[in-house]
Amino acid sequence: MYPRGVKRSQHDRHKQTAFRTIKRSITHRPTSKFISHFAKNFRGKLAPLKQLDESRLDALSLTELEQLKTIIEEKQQEKRAQNNAITFLPNLPTVPFADTNFSIKSLGLRPYNGDARDPKQRIRDRFPQTHERICLLTNDILETDLLLRYRQCLDSLTREENQQLMGDRIFSLTNSPCLAFTVATVEEACSYFKFHDLHNLPVNPQDLFMYTITVMKFEFFNKLNMAKLTCVFNDNGHGDIEYRKLRQLCGKPVLDREMPNSEFEVQQQTPDSFRHPIQQAMSIVVTFARILRQIKEHIIRTKKPQFIRDFDTERVAERYECGLISRLIGKQFSNHKCDDVSCQNRIERIMAPWKPSLFFCTYFAKDAPKFKLFPNLPHEYRNLSFTCPKVDMEPSCSYSTSRDLPQTSHRSHKNQGTPKVKSKVCVEKPDTSNLTTTKTTTEILIEESMETDNKIPDPRELNFNQAKQDEIVIININENVNSKHESESSVEMDLDLDYEADTCETNLNTYSSDSE
């Protein structure tokens, strides 16, 4: 407030009026005074938002709402196409990805003369054959033309073949049996990345190995996360904080605690700045994924070939060596020592492949399913079918009719009298001179049981069979009442309850063997 007798200056009056006008425009209050240029622009931006009124939407009919829904979906597809242009690359020519200008002599490579198969056959077959060599030395990977031939084969694939190949690789990554297989896949992609950086080749973002590095980052973290990482990182102290750093490095949310650095700052750090080997290995994969994302963006914008050296400012690819990630992971887990049995068991499980536990088969040879495999598989793998050996005995789940079963005397429910003599059942033996036309009794029973299962029962027949069964039971009971019964001690089998109790007892102290 100004003192009495002092008038406000004209400048302050205009400033206060402009502030009041902006405040009214923000709160959508009508005003009769002049509106500043800022308020006009602000109100113009709010005009489309006013059109989305609930009363107007309620006034629309069902047809108009369907049309509005169609328009919104089309706009969303256009937005997705613009945002995902880096992924699909629809308007890019093949010139930035072509490597026809590069030869073995210009790159300083030597021809590969090892035992590995031709890259065209490997890409066609999707997985190695039996006893095929896939473990290569570092010199064979970086100094020969083997990876260059892989690059040429991948560039020559059609869009459908490339998508099929990438889908198979992503499926194998997400369903990896153990951490060892995931680490081997990550090493394969990083070695391919190293080869492009070493020989300064232009990057193809649609490449099989380049495209799936981002997927590898998340699957690599998922496999590592199966271990008790808070205990593994606790060797140098602060295991919880180091685990949260790993989550930030992989882009996973950390909401339960405030971290000193943001996710962006952690991902920009070099691998050498981290304390633990697992963090260093993850930092290498994250750095390669970030470089590829930047390369994709520049290819979309410039439509020119891009190289790794132009984006790898910290020279991470230059310092990377083939097999470095597996050595870092092995170093971290092998040097970890703790008294936690669950931590040791987890490390052992994630490093060893899972073992299937199929103890018996429920399929018969006749009903066994036959799985059709991919037509591009090798010839020796095309005729695979999941079958079980032929069963000669009748399955326990099937049943036979009462007229086909051998007639045996029924025991009485009473426990008195002398034992009765078991009646012998005579089964006609098949003629050995005509084996081709004769069927065994078991096969006849199986066929009749299958026919009975497939037949629709008649209610009248069911009632007749039930009455006939009751009549047979009554006759058998009346016959056995007048007969003498055997004593209880000579017939009844004593259950060895002590043996069952010993075998069914669960020993709760079974952790001593694990700790040893």
From Swiss-Prot:
Binding site for Zn(2+): 231, 336, 338, 343
Official protein name in the record: mRNA export factor ICP27 homolog
Record field: compositional bias (Polar residues): 399-409
General function of this protein: Immediate early (EI) protein that plays many roles during productive infection including regulation of viral gene expression and nuclear export of intronless viral RNAs.
Chain ranges of zinc fingers (CHC2-type): 231-343
Region (Disordered): 399-423
Cited InterPro entries: ICP27-like
Alphabetized UniProt keyword annotations: Host cytoplasm, Host nucleus, Metal-binding, Transcription, Transcription regulation, Virion, Virion tegument, Zinc, Zinc-finger
GO CC term (a single one): host cell cytoplasm
Organism lineage string: Viruses, Duplodnaviria, Heunggongvirae, Peploviricota, Herviviricetes
One Gene Ontology MF term: zinc ion binding
BP-aspect Gene Ontology terms: regulation of DNA-templated transcription
Main location as per UniProt: virion
Family: Belongs to the HHV-1 ICP27 protein family.
Localisation per UniProt entry: Virion tegument; Virion; Host nucleus; Host cytoplasm
Tagged with keyword DNA-binding: no
